[in-house]
Amino acid sequence: MKVVASDADNLTGPHISSGTPHSFQVVSDDELLALVAVKELNIRRRFEQVLEEVKNTRRDLLLFRSRLEEARGMRSDPKTEVRQQLAALDMATVTLVERSINGIRKNANETQSIEQEFGDIRDELENNAVPDVKPMLERIDEGIITPLHSINTLDYNQIDDSLVLLRKVLEETVLEQRADPFARFDESVDQLNLTIERLEAVLAQMLKLETVNEALQMLRDIIKAQEELQEKTRLERKKKLIEGLQ
């Protein structure tokens, strides 16, 4: 489709201009749902990757917390070798937390993109007035988009804030100010636990949506097969009727 317009210049015109052509693909409801199912599958795979990365962040924080806990009794040892080992551990922990902050921000951006893409899918289904799609729209709204929006606007920000505070405490430790990082570690891990639980709940809804899509497709296939059988029966009856008149 292309929009073309002309002005009312009677002296040197009319002048005609046109917009950029836009191509539209007309598909059946079944074809649209099949395309949507492919989109959902690809988005879900990306979401599973995000969830795995958030879990890895939690795992790394717990690992380094454990290492700091093990080294706690060495803090009073004045030996140069021990001081060097502790300094190396402290620096490695700061680096780990910095990497975790960057990773969580990347995960947040990806999850925001996933929320937007599911919103686009929902709008596409609604705007095309696909029949029998209301249960799917409700599942997308209530099970995926709404909780993802909460995760994006609240959970990720809370994780980010807690990790930034943890980094600050660890930097104070590196500067020999003897800050205790364990409470901050626990706050970050607790927030990650809560967010992972919510991400897993969204993933479960995505998997349910896939099951619903498969069930709807099976129903459509059955209806289509019945219609084809009815048409075949009608044609056979018509053929026999014509043969009987000859």
Show where each model-derived region lies.
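Extracytoplasmic/secretory ectodomains and luminal regions
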Residues: M1-Q246
